[in-house]
Amino acid sequence: MQGCRQRESNKICTRDGPGGMLTARGLAVFRAERLVFRDLDFSLVPATLRPAGEGAPDAVTLIGPNGSGKSTLLRLLAGFVRPAVGTVWWQEEPLPADPADRARIVTYIGHQDAVKPGLTAAENLLFDASWHPRGRRREAILNALEAVGLSALSALPGRMLSAGQKRRLALSRLMLRETPVWLLDEPTLGLDDASIALFGDMLRAHRARGGVVMAATHVPLPLPGAGVLSLHPHALAAQTGQAAIEGAGDEWAGDEWG
């Protein structure tokens, strides 16, 4: 991971100032009365805006043990959690606090699939399809289902889908929303190799269009060239809640994955 600078407590690849597409400075978050992390900086810059291999990445994977703040960070960026301190910028302006405005920028896929059992696969996508003109919604839904290999199951009720099919249905929402920022929590949970390959195609196309990705995971993801942001509570965390956060390059971080 290139373009790093080091702070007193943490280090992560950044750009000076809010110059990236998605940039955070000095983030700290509490869960109840416990400090989850602090002094967290990062930048995500689309590949279309930087020379190849230079500067901040367009994708970052979040790794670390359970409870280290991976999901909390994603939920913060999605607007569901407020930071105790710190700022997040979107194209040199503070990320909008209004949910409707933020939803035009980020799509968040949590670790739960949010599939309604009484609705068909296609009907489960109606809300996300509302971002499209009314006359194009059916086509948009069918295209999204095709992208994740669920075209043949469009009329099947959610309760009849397997765990992997429900996960693919959740990921198809990315194709409907078409936002520049994807926030993904354990996106490949329950997916087989063929489904992961389809998801990899989605990620490549998104990044090629200038999109950026932040994903929490315990397993390798199809995100070649992504940076790694490690959240590791240590002895100090037991006293202050501080997390050790480190930019770790493009290689797997050894035993940290598991």
Curated annotation (Swiss-Prot):
It is found in: Cell inner membrane. Belongs to the ABC transporter superfamily. CcmA exporter (TC 3.A.1.107) family. InterPro entries: AAA+_ATPase, ABC_transporter-like_ATP-bd, ABC_transporter-like_CS, ABC_transptr_haem_export_CcmA, P-loop_NTPase. This is Cytochrome c biogenesis ATP-binding export protein CcmA. SUPFAM superfamilies: P-loop containing nucleoside triphosphate hydrolases. ATP binds at G64, P65, N66, G67, S68, G69, K70, S71. GO terms for biological process: cytochrome complex assembly. It catalyses: heme b(in) + ATP + H2O = heme b(out) + ADP + phosphate + H(+). Its EC number is 7.6.2.5. One of its GO terms (molecular function) is ATP binding. One of its GO terms (cellular component) is plasma membrane. It is a peripheral membrane protein. The complex is composed of two ATP-binding proteins (CcmA) and two transmembrane proteins (CcmB). Its main location: membrane. Gene3D superfamilies: P-loop containing nucleotide triphosphate hydrolases. Part of the ABC transporter complex CcmAB involved in the biogenesis of c-type cytochromes; once thought to export heme, this seems not to be the case, but its exact role is uncertain. Responsible for energy coupling to the transport system. Keywords: ATP-binding, Cell inner membrane, Cell membrane, Cytochrome c-type biogenesis, Membrane, Nucleotide-binding, Translocase, Transport. The keyword Metal-binding does not apply. Residues 30-257 form the ABC transporter domain. It is an enzyme of class 7 (translocase). Disulfide bonds: none annotated.
